[in-house]
Swiss-Prot record:
ATP binds at residues 30-33, 87-91, 414, 477-479, 493. One of its GO terms (molecular function) is isomerase activity. This is Chaperonin GroEL. Belongs to the chaperonin (HSP60) family. The keyword Nucleotidyltransferase does not apply. It is an enzyme of class 5 (isomerase). PROSITE patterns: CHAPERONINS_CPN60 (PS00296). Together with its co-chaperonin GroES, plays an essential role in assisting protein folding. The GroEL-GroES system forms a nano-cage that allows encapsulation of the non-native substrate proteins and provides a physical environment optimized to promote and accelerate protein folding. It comes from the Bacteria.
Amino acid sequence: MAAKLIAFDEEARSKLLTGVLKLSKAVKATLGPKGRYVVLERKFGSPLITNDGVTIAKEIDLEDPYENLGAQLAKEVASKTNDVAGDGTTTATVLAEAMVREGMKNVTAGANPIALRRGIEKAVEAVTEEIKKLSRPVSGKRDITEVATISAKDQQIGSIIAEAMEKVGKDGVVTVEEGKSLGMELEFVEGMQFDRGYVSPYFVTDPERMETVLEDPLIVITDKKISNVQEFLPLLEKIVQYGRSFLLIADDVEGEALATLVVNKLRGTFNCVAVKAPGFGDRRKEMLQDIAIVTGGQVISEELGVSFESVTPDMFGHARSVKVDKESTTIVGGKGSSEEIEKRIAQIRKQLETTESEYEKEKLQERLAKLAGGVAVIKVGAATETEMKEKKHRVEDAVSATKAAMEEGIVAGGGVTLVKASTVLDKLPLENDELIGATIVKKALMEPARVIAENAGFAGEVVVEELKKREYPVGFDAVKGEYVDMFEAGIIDPTKVTRSALQNAASIAAMVLTTEALVVEKPEQEKAQPGMPPEEY
């Protein structure tokens, strides 16, 4: 077993702080409308140019093992915020850095880290409530356009996303693909998405994005648990005869059957992906039936008197394409009869009218959206591959931000909401080190607005002081260098993004401040090559 290195107390915390600061410095340069870009080296292919916080953070690994732990914790802030809200990763990193930096000063000066942590947690709770009060719901296409435009820093992207959202609605699905042309195109396709991903990562066809994409696949739908390969073989042989890729949706796929699929996929015998059926109990049966109707297939079920041996070709579903990642499956362009789909929609609407349960209504509404909503596909094109990847990143972030805005509403952007929400901390009944914890949060809340101004070439401290005097929602437009009503100017952020950034930053900051020891593996010294033996003459 490799030997370990241990650092304690002040040394441990200062190393963590250095790691957080290094990562943050690279990430925060991208914040705001005048934020810079960061170029990331790729081992293969062209370098990636991006201003997406989480993408930059994921690329950073530091040489010093202690500092690297700090960088990894800061990376976690960006990653968690991206998972929850899909955007706001740079803001989250900036907040975390400010809290850790201010907190370290106080811990070094003798403050109790546990009391500081309590103060930080109470302060964040109060500010989160204040952010919710300052929030307002999204009203109409203009708000959606503005949220997407701010996230992507591009008016055209904002307009296209707003159009896509308008077509599919709040419950619809928007996917982003690489396009063939130089510009951006919006395609609206009847499709369906459910929250079940692949049962094994070996099915992945795109390792960079960790997803499986199948073009024109067969779709096999069954409510059986498949583990015995002998039972499954007759069905597999029928599928392989077609020489096409296939999606297998089953109650579960495990054991020999899963191994058989994986091995044949890796050998290139056929291309496939297996996913678990969505839902539970009776709802699972209904959802499988929905998928069958959308794809023009039939559920293979013992209850319907259909076994794997008796399957006929017309029982397979068909679709234009299928995209599966770790958490969801999207079926695009299902070849089901529109008449049958309309009948199914009418049936669900009837059930909606008669059901009493709120939970049941919500689930029926979800199924309705999946059947009627469809999928909007945004195709992103550019002159070079590097530019296209960067643009695609921005579009994906903007789609996530827009969905977040539709969920929890919007607040004024440019960091002004955090500055305004900080005033609630003056009324918190805290004392001693807990009060210092709240003060740490208050100082950190000024940081995003300051960094946005400085990245645009203005004096950050002056801008923050001016924002404190102004009435919400007046903020600083970093493009024009003016103080404006942020809602009227269209500078808005999703409430969910702002809230998640703050909560995740505080969580990591509190963890760093209460750290007392670091344990890392001792780097192995590379042994020198042995010398050549003397030549004999």
